[in-house]
């Protein structure tokens, strides 16, 4: 057998191994990732990626979705700011920094997150004061509400262990847990008198957390809940 023939055979074996790998990954995905949904692509500045997108990678984030009834209560209370700020369509609480994964990493990442949080006890999310936050580029200001539940810090610590196992960045050292409600790109840093919220009126118990990777959202059930 010539050197050329040996090289061609090696390439064929390599191609077969690659096909087997993709088949195995597809089987794993169907087994471990049943709760996922395709969402309509919407222009929502609250979820715009700040990190540059690389070809072959899927931008991702892990977050808690704020229920519509809680969102409506908060937006009613902050209606006075609507003349100067534009509303953000879907309210959420970020639990990780933005990150990127390659396609073959996605099944294992989702599996690891689900494994970590399935025993995490149910807790109540409460809100505190409103605050104005600037983005890193200093060109957009967000009207945000503080999240005051101490349990959410433990949840972030737990997710940090998953992030590090995939060589991804941990959450910010200076933790300002919040949900952005509205934004503006003009008259930045203009002072406002911001109000507080009654914890009893604006609170909820999350049953799940979400993982968004590209346009697909995966649902992960928190411990003490069933779906």
Question: Can you annotate each of these PLM segments?
Answer:
Residues 1-227:
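Histidine-dependent nucleotide/RNA phosphoesterase domain, centered on the 2H-phosphoesterase fold
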